[in-house]
Amino acid sequence: MAIPTKERGSRLTDADILSDLQMYKPVTDSDTRNVWAFWDKGLSNSPAWNQRNVISWVRRLSPKWTVRVLDLVEGSPNHVSQFIPREMLTDVFWNRTMTGPHVGQHSSDLIRLPLLYLYGGVWLDVGMLLFRSLDALCWNALEDPETPYEVAAFKVSMGPELSFLFNGFIAARRGSVCIKYWHEIFRTLWDGATSCAGMHSHPLLAHLPVYEPPSLNGKRPPFMYAQFADYLAQVFCLERLRHLVDSKTGWDGPKFFEEKVLLFDCVTEAYWAQRLTDWNGRKQYELLDLQRGEDGLDNARVKEAEALVQGVLSMSSTMKLSHGLVTAGREYLADIWDSPKNHDADIRPGTFAAYLREASETFEQTKELVPLRMPVIEKALLRAGVTEVVR
């Protein structure tokens, strides 16, 4: 499948775009098409492939969308404090006293919801490649006054009954009460905490069932459930809200999700490369690093690489490369590409990786999107205040 070429007007260099991304861009009342991302040390200090992801977003989405990557660099024009009032976040965030192996990820978790509530738009993790315009993916539906949708996201299925929302891609109208309450719950978990350890058993989440990841190979996951649930504490805060009915505020979680949340399948739309390779990051790296020349298509390994990239481009709107949980024996493509020796692995001429990089700027996915529902878990239903502990 050849990558269709799209007319995009004058093309700025990577350096030009990166320089522009360092500038402060205020949000006006009329701005709705905002893309939000975060790298605590500043975008220019992120791995090169992450920088190119964001640069590719700009090429794909400009001029309709404004991309901002916030940071925690002292004096930076894109410091989080330029966009979020201090009272919306905890002291552990502002004082940089968070601990644990995922400080960057959880700092990012803390800011994404305030940004969406205050300004609206789409949150993207910097590990995402785009293969479809955000307008076609979800924003046209959110913006249309004839539709009820306020929020759009990807659904992670843990089995026939259990599912949760992937927080690496969240789109929301400005002022969505769902985003507001979700953040209130998550912020409460961080009151007095310096790490995510033990958050899965916080009183606000203790009533939720165990969301055990499904086995892909007949074996149990290579990590403890508590480790998994603590890492994903933010998504379980939404599980509380999704199953909550609060008579004082009028919030009805099951009704809101039934009527106002636009959901698509997460594996199909973001993790198809992982599905095709049994979540083997080393295999993904080796296949994408192969040369794509026509002369090599008789080679079985090259055919496998071709099937991987064409599978992704025929199936997915995005491609998410996660670092995930630190797990013995598991490699992630994101970690491999982070290595300085692989600083150009996503753009090495003639490789399948370079083909995907080109696709992230020029290919437009047109596959029909099928909205999904999230089943209500009866034993998780709760009548209480948004942050009320019920014992």
UniProtKB/Swiss-Prot annotation:
Gene3D superfamilies xrefs: 3.90.550.20
pH dependence text: Optimum pH is 8.0.
Regulation: Activity is significantly decreased by addition of divalent cations such as Mg(2+), Mn(2+), Zn(2+), Ca(2+), Co(2+), Cu(2+), and Ni(2+); while Fe(2+) has little effect.
EC number(s) on file: 2.4.1.-
Source superkingdom: Eukaryota
Pathway participation: Secondary metabolite biosynthesis
GO molecular function: glycosyltransferase activity
Annotated InterPro entries: AfumC-like_glycosyl_Trfase, Nucleotide-diphossugar_trans
Knocked-out gene: effects: Failed to produce fumihopaside A, but leads to the accumulation of the aglycone intermediate.
Family, per entry: Belongs to the afumC glycosyltransferase family.
Job description of the protein: Glycosyltransferase; part of the gene cluster that mediates the biosynthesis fumihopaside A, a hopane-type glucoside that enhances the thermotolerance and UV resistance of N.fumigata. The first step of fumihopaside A biosynthesis is performed by the squalene hopane cyclase afumA that catalyzes the cyclization of 3S-oxidosqualene into the hopene 21-beta-H-hopane-3-beta,22-diol.
Name of the protein this chain belongs to: Glycosyltransferase afumC
Origin species: Aspergillus fumigatus (strain CBS 144.89 / FGSC A1163 / CEA10) (Neosartorya fumigata)
Top-level taxonomy: Eukaryota, Fungi, Dikarya, Ascomycota, Pezizomycotina
Gene from which the chain derives: afumC
